[in-house]
Amino acid sequence: MENQASLNSIQKTVWDGKLPLQITLASSESRTFDQTDPYLISCPRISYLPSLLPRLRSFFASSLIEPKSQPHEGWFSFEGVPLKWHLPIGLLYDLYAGADPASKGSRPDESEQIISSVGDTLPWRLTLHFSDWPDEELVRLDADGMVMHDAFINSVKEADFLRNGTAKGIMSLSKEDSSGLWEAVQDVDLPSFQRISNILLPAPNQPFRNVPIRFFLPLPPDSGSPSLKVVQSPLPPSIPASTANATQSTVLRGKPASQLQTIGSALHSLLPNLFPSRRTPVLAKPVLHGAAVPMSAPVEEVARSAAYGDGWVYIVVRMMG
């Protein structure tokens, strides 16, 4: 496993990541004839859209047809698609608008195309609504923020159970630490987050039971299925060794040889048609925090350094070509 300093450096880079947003009030809810001025903000990738609602409600207050609307009644859409408020902003962008991520192997002409494509999608243009809540697609929020808080903590519990085989860690947290974990994500306070999350993580010399990873596969609008398909399965950090990858193999006393589970081996196991090779992206590539993930990256190292605030690694599978 990489040394802890390297993993901490990656985690800091992830938490420093931001995304420019341009948020416009839905024209059907604006009292002005022309479109209202948009709200521009650089938002942390690990944060959640509902955290913006109080300031957006104040910003658009003079333009609202319904002046009694409350911040928690707000919801967001992108190109007519309601956005899941329980997913981090960075993940939502990677799912719906992210351009093809640059990689070290890109040729100069390819890099220019990538930069041009990114420029077309940034700032990310979202529409804000305060009426006609899409009940079939989104759970309603509440004025006290408890719906959002509970959704986050439940996700933390799921990740904790997969890592340790039990959720005793999160269940035994004090009320102060439980609330503090969510507040640290909202405030993008990495030191406070690390202090609490380190209570939940197995020690560096203790492997995870399973690694909490979800793979998202965007589907075409005319597929007749939901717009997103999520693939998830228990992924242990090590797997039986193959003769083709003996360099990563370790032989434990009285146990069969094993090797590190990588992003490539996990994708090949779960999605063999899209990832026929464990080592090289052929038809699709894994994207995390807007960047292509090396197929050789061990899944546990990815989880320790680049998970979102709820402990989950959310990887978007993007088709190539």
Swiss-Prot record:
The keyword Cell membrane does not apply. Keywords: Autophagy, Isopeptide bond, Membrane, Protein transport, Transport, Ubl conjugation. Conjugated to atg12; which is essential for autophagy. GO terms for cellular component: Atg12-Atg5-Atg16 complex; autophagosome; mitochondria-associated endoplasmic reticulum membrane contact site; phagophore; phagophore assembly site membrane. The keyword Ubl conjugation applies. One of its GO terms (biological process) is piecemeal microautophagy of the nucleus. It is a peripheral membrane protein. It is found in: Preautophagosomal structure membrane. Signal peptide: none annotated. InterPro entries: Atg5, ATG5_HBR, Atg5_HR, ATG5_UblA, Atg5_UblA_dom_sf, ATG5_UblB. There is a cross-link at residue 157 (Glycyl lysine isopeptide (Lys-Gly) (interchain with G-Cter in atg12)). GO terms for molecular function: Atg8-family ligase activity. It comes from the Eukaryota. Involved in cytoplasm to vacuole transport (Cvt) and autophagic vesicle formation. Autophagy is essential for maintenance of amino acid levels and protein synthesis under nitrogen starvation. Required for selective autophagic degradation of the nucleus (nucleophagy). Also required for mitophagy, which eliminates defective or superfluous mitochondria in order to fulfill cellular energy requirements and prevent excess ROS production. Belongs to the ATG5 family. Conjugated with atg12. This is Autophagy protein 5. It comes from Aspergillus clavatus (strain ATCC 1007 / CBS 513.65 / DSM 816 / NCTC 3887 / NRRL 1 / QM 1276 / 107). The gene is atg5.
